[in-house]
Amino acid sequence: MCIRDRHISGLATFHLTVVPSFDGGQVFIEMQDSETGIRLGHATMDVRYHAGGYEAQTVIPGQTITMLMEFQGIDALLPAGHGITFVLSESGEDYLPPACTPSCSMHIIPSVSTVEIPVIYRDGSNVLITPQGEDAANNQ
């Protein structure tokens, strides 16, 4: 929990350490305001693209890998006192489940997974002020 509002802005990343049971499957992560349940952002990734890029890689069942996940761009205000909840599933409400379901499960290792969330702090001194000419409407 934070004692002041947080402005989450940009591309949050989640490096999720998993042990897949199959050469296939996916992870869907939803970031929520823990007080209201409002969805702040989401990320999804097929395990075969765990290293990023456009080429699928063969995944060896039982091998520990890190999925380099990136959330869709976020621009959200998280009020003071609110926390963040991450909900993980295999498909989420916006995506179809993988073709190999239910045989392509993954064991997630949260203790070595990391998340980075870009936050902008505003204190009044760093607010964007656009230069105005003397004839600008807000100077009249």
PLM features per residue range, with description:
Residues 1:
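Sequence context surrounding c-type heme c attachment/ligation sites in exported
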Residues 4-140:
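Glycine/threonine-rich phosphate-binding loop and adjacent beta-strand/alpha-helix elements that clamp
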